[in-house]
Amino acid sequence: MKDLKRYHVLFVLLLSVNVLSTTPVKAQQTIQFSQYVFNGLAVNPAYAGYKEDLTVNLSFRSQWVGIDGAPRTGTASIDGLTKNPDKKVGLGLIATTDRLGPQNTSSVYANYAYRLRLDAEDTKRLSFGIAFGATQYNLDGSKFIATDPGDGTIPVGNQSKLSPDVRFGIYYYTPKFYIGASAVDLLTTGRDTVTSDSYRIIKQVRHIYLTGGVMIPLSESFDLKPTFMIKEDFKGPTNVDLNAYLLINKVVWVGASYRTGVKFWDKTNLQRGLDQNDAISGILEVFINPRFRIGYSYDYTTSKLSNYQQGSHEVSVSFSLQGKRERVLSPRYF
């Protein structure tokens, strides 16, 4: 009975993230991070070079702790400027791996950003970015529990598919404000991908991100930074992240986030009565020094999955490798 309940919970998990349907097996759509505001390259290629110094970001997320097969995600990125004295070109590389039940996904993207200077003080820039990469999808058929041993829709052995992708983004920033938009999975057809063994395992859809934030000085020691992210795939509920951070002496960041699905317009293919609740998060970031940051976040799930798991944990580290380039004129808070 215990094993039956465990597999039932895993089945609910897979359904909730669109991994399984009644006929084909589908891939998880876009990876979730609570600390995306500290690594904009994960959602927008135009972010490459924003901090100007060569910057490395590492993060790991363990989602829905307590559920067998729940998502485990790691990412590593590096970005910076070329030696062009006008600081017009930013380059970046990001690699991500994600495991969810029988599915494993790995991707690598090379990012290029062209940065237009908009004022004499060089505090305002408009950046256009593009990324080229590929994603390797793997599905382990041995991890499925079949009620009918002769079910031909269950994959046999390991199924895999390599898919190229293009991303595009635009990013505008000042010392006190930023806004960005990006589109990912631009090469997808929206159709199921068929492997050599005729198993349909992947159905990626295009996603659009809109992000923004402001820096509000409260006193000499405190600043408030509210941010948002809207994620749209034109199929499921529109996903909205609302965040607020209190900066203490520019060293400690204490924040909270609320993530939910919203209905901006009527989507005819959207399941009626779908639970759009997602999570609330507590976030702590500490700058050990101006070039080294460490962060932790905890997500409390507000959906029906809350009865089956103990939340999600995410840790991140970033550090800057400052070379001979002149120091950045204004701090990079985004």
Which functions belong to the PLM regions below?
Residues 1-11:
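Bacterial N-terminal signal peptides that target proteins for export
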Residues 1-2, 16, 121:
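Short intrinsically disordered, low-complexity coil segments enriched in acidic
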Residues 11-19:
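Bacterial N-terminal signal peptides
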Residues 20-21, 209:
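A detector of low-complexity, intrinsically disordered, Ser/Thr/Gly/Pro/Ala-rich segments
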Residues 23-27:
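Sec/Tat signal peptide C-region and signal peptidase I cleavage site
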Residues 28-334:
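Subset of outer-membrane beta-barrel
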